[in-house]
């Protein structure tokens, strides 16, 4: 089975930002699997969150990115699975904390709430940050 660096999906509200992000990631030589949606026609965000979740669980990729209107619904839908730690990140600091303290495996972005000027910095920080373990591991065990 082919694996990817990142699996990504959006609803219709996040489609344009998703397209920009995919291009950015590919320029960084990262392999990206796009689960849709593939246009701005209205769709149901839980369907696309589930696609990324399933691909993470099936180990198609270790990291996922979801983009919705605000990202709230996407993060709720993704976090229904016990194997997923989806984090809605709005800036570099939240992206760093999501990985360092919570070992997040899905970055969630709100197309209408994230600053498009810093979205690449958010993604870079999320991808570069390693889980610190230690006391954070103990805390994660309490929510599994």
Swiss-Prot record:
It holds the Pfam family LacAB_rpiB. Keywords: Isomerase. The active site is at 101 (proton donor). InterPro entries: RpiB, RpiB_LacA_LacB, RpiB_LacA_LacB_sf. GO terms for biological process: carbohydrate metabolic process. Disulfide bonds: none annotated. It comes from the Bacteria. Substrate binds at residues 12, 135. It is an enzyme of class 5 (isomerase). GO terms for molecular function: intramolecular oxidoreductase activity, interconverting aldoses and ketoses. Its EC number is 5.3.1.-. Belongs to the LacAB/RpiB family. NCBIfam families: PRK05571.1, rpiB, rpiB_lacA_lacB. This is Putative sugar phosphate isomerase RBE_0278.
């Amino acid at each position: 089975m082919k694996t990817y660096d990142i699996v990504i999906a959006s609803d219709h509200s996040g489609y344009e930002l998703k397209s920009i992000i995919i291009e950015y990631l590919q320029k960084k030589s990262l392999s990206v699997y796009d689960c849709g949606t593939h246009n701005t026609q209205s769709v149901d965000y839980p369907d696309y969150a589930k696609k990324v979740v399933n691909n993470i669980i099936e180990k198609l990729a270790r990291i996922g990115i979801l983009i919705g209107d605000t990202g709230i619904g996407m993060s709720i839908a993704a976090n229904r699975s016990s194997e997923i730690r989806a984090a809605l990140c709005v800036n570099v600091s939240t992206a760093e904390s999501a990985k360092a303290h919570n070992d997040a495996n899905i970055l969630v972005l709100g197309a209408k709430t994230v600053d498009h000027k810093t979205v690449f910095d958010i993604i870079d920080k999320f991808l570069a940050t390693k889980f610190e373990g230690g006391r954070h591991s103990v805390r994660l065990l309490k929510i599994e």
